[in-house]
Amino acid sequence: RVRRILVVRNDNIGDVLCTTPALRALRRAFPEAHLAILVAEHCRAAVLRNPDLTEVLTYTKAKHRPRGLGLAALWDLTHAIRRLRAQRFDLAIAMRRPFSRSNAWLAYAAGAPFRLGYLPPASHPFRFFLNLGREVGAVASHEVDGCLGLLASIGIPPAGRALHLDPDPEAQAAIRRRLREAGLPPPAPGPGPAGEVAGGSGLALVHISNRRETSRWPLASFAQAADALHERLGLAILLSWSPGDSQNPLFPGDDGKAEEVARGMRARPIFLRTPELRELIAAVSLCNFVLSTDGGIMHIAAALDIPQVVLFGKTGPEHWAPVTEKGQILRSGGRADRISVDEVVAASVEVMSRWGRGKMFAAARGTTGRRTAARGEG
């Protein structure tokens, strides 16, 4: 009988959020089980308040530690493995596709007698890390469906595809204070988007960062689009980015780029520096709209049910599109920088006229209720 289950997901924020439907399916299949997840420390806030989990375990990857602290990283990982083995898990699930040696090794090192995952070729030297699973085949389906499909291989049915994310109330309160200090009347407390602020406006979070070159949008384009969101839709602009210096080898930041975008805007944006993931999650939860490129932020918005427009580069939407009906995906030849500002503004107006706050957005669009399907994958 399976009483203790470990899910291993040691990659990034969006990947972790795409695992949350599988966590729901596991909880429904094993309502009394101890269900734990092991994630990288920087992803902790993505699952810390997840109601399907009994426990969240973390470790810090070596690449996210300062140089010269290799021994500290090894000690941290060794300590994490000791904690895992002490828990005596019955089932460990390596929740990555295709096969990841580091992910499968963590499942193996946990000492569980049953280790489920997507299997590598039969000749792979580390195939023994897993003793249950399925062949990955072509990685064509969505990541959410890949996670659910792995569970289906051992008879666990899905329990929906929606992502789950609970914001930290203390972090939300802190963001409200920061908005007030920035001169923006705070949104009303409570669940869901912030709603109206002074003058009937709402909040748009514009996230400019992306590590992939093909997924970056020109800074001048971000500035023009942000001005259009403010002028046409009456949205106050929260400028969001990966904080820090661009030369930081651990977590490269875009402080300089954020300043450049702000200088290029006619409107005055609110700088929203979020060193901690829980702060970024809280900020998104208080917004009415998100504009971003294809990264973790789009999955945060989807999990929080916030309308969005996402600019995709080379990344395949069939695998990584945000799981939501409230959005549009824009693509152009595998490069985000080929998408025009006019396309982004038109998509934003369309999304907000359909899923925004009613008549204000319909009026901005020049229509009174026409509906068209979003191009995002739900």
Regions found by a protein language model. Give the residues of each.
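Catalytic machinery of carbohydrate-active enzymes
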Residues: 1-378
